[in-house]
């Protein structure tokens, strides 16, 4: 497993549209996914220990952010042929197991991950209502272990600020995770 860190936020970068199939049978794009105050686009997968470590807390925070007008879409871009745990069928199982309240979509061609310059899972992009990037950072300090007792909810706090001001925090810490598994 290769661990990578994401680059920091390119403030104002405009979200690139996509049309990806969700585990709910719906095709999702930016217009359908975004909330009145913003959108989280996150690249996750099923097998990465960094994602597994945060998933229960991530799902909980996303539910709270929804009440603040922030919607979320999760994109799985890993090669499911070489990583069968990341198959579409297994995505459905994870979404059901954790009771996802957000769309979980498959990036079969990996074009969306490439257009966003996604590096790893998890990789978080926080956009304001105009779909301008305001946050590209970590979920929290967990890494792939237990959450520290003094855990700061970086993504939650950033998106709460974006919902209130449409601007992200100037100080951001990069996400760390497993490399995206590119097709050959």
Which role fits each region the language model picked out?
Residues 1-163, 168-172, 179-184:
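Chalcogenol-based redox active-site neighborhoods
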């Amino acid at each position: 497993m290769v661990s990578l860190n994401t680059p920091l936020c390119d403030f104002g970068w405009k979200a690139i549209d996509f049309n990806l199939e969700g585990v709910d049978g719906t095709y999702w794009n930016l217009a359908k996914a975004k909330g009145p105050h913003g959108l989280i686009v996150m690249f996750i997968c099923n097998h990465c220990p960094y994602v597994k470590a945060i998933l229960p807390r991530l799902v909980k925070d996303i539910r709270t952010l929804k009440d603040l007008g922030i919607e979320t879409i999760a994109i799985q871009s890993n090669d499911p042929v070489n990583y069968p745990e990341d198959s579409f069928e297994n995505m459905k199982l994870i979404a059901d197991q954790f009771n996802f309240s957000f769309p979980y979509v498959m990036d079969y061609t990996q074009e969306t991950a490439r257009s966003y310059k996604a590096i790893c899972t998890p990789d978080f992009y926080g956009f304001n209502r105009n779909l301008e990037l305001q946050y590209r950072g970590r979920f929290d300090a967990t890494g792939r272990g237990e959450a520290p007792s003094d855990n700061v909810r970086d993504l939650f706090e950033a998106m709460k600020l974006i919902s209130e001001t449409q601007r992200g925090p100037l100080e951001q810490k990069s996400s760390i995770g497993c490399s995206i598994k590119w097709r050959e």
